[in-house]
Amino acid sequence: VDIAGLVRGASHGEGLGNKFLSHIRECDAIVHVVRCFEDDNIIHVDGSVDPARDIETINLELVFADMETVEKRLDKARKLFKTGDKKYVAEAETAEKLYAHLESGKPARTCALTEDEQAIVDGWFLLTDKPVIYVANIAEDALDGIDTNPLVHIVRDIARQEHAECVAISAQIEEEIAGMEADERAMFLEELGIEKSGLDTLITACYHLLGLISFLTAGSDECRAWTIKRGTKAPQAAGKIHTDFERGFIRAEIVPFETLK
């Protein structure tokens, strides 16, 4: 889901508001693109390039939205735990703990919760509990200096503090290669000294973040990739292709890739 840029006050209906915040709840992870380049021809809504400020602006809106959700859960749990049901006592205590954490401006994913508390929170579909990848969007001519780029360092430090992932890519380059044929694209990337495109880098990071892998099936007329959770066993992987394959699964055979080729 491509969510348009959020502004201050989005959690209270400013800009594109709550409608777009609700779309994020349906996602498995959030890819947060952060501007890390200077260009006088591209105006910034706040008048300057400051990755830390931009990240804080978005994160606070998500935190505010989550505070509203947790507050409603807390009110409901407080009313129901009077019945003596321990379920609602635990829910109220978890909501109180998490609300205090959110109130300090921190995302839910950094709150130290027990397994039981996390199981409760998982059912609330909080925005700031979702795994995040920060994408530092750099200029085309900054690719050689990613590791020494101060703006990228800022994003990486924030990602580290939040237990999030971070990749640096140039959206400008991605736009240029999007319309190229495969051979032309490979040659272009080679000239830039890049092993793989930013999109491929981002996809790999997303797979890692969500604990996913792919396996391939190949035939005379089709080659296809199937996405499964890391650690999925062979019968369940076969079931992704067709349920009959899982029901009738007999065995998996290990073959060296060189032999397969």
State where each predicted segment sits.
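C-terminal-of-GTPase-core extension/linker across diverse P-loop GTPases
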Residues: 76-261
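Conserved phosphoryl-transfer catalytic core
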Residues: 67-74
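Substrate-engagement module of ASCE P-loop NTPases
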Residues: 26, 61, 66, 157-162
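Residue-level signature of catalytic and energy-coupling elements of molecular machines
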Residues: 2, 20, 31, 70, ...
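Active-site-proximal flexible loops/turns
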Residues: 9, 42, 73, 144, ...
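A ubiquitous short alpha-helical element
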Residues: 58-62, 171
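Switch II of P-loop NTPase G domains
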Residues: 1-32, 36-59, 113-124, 148-151
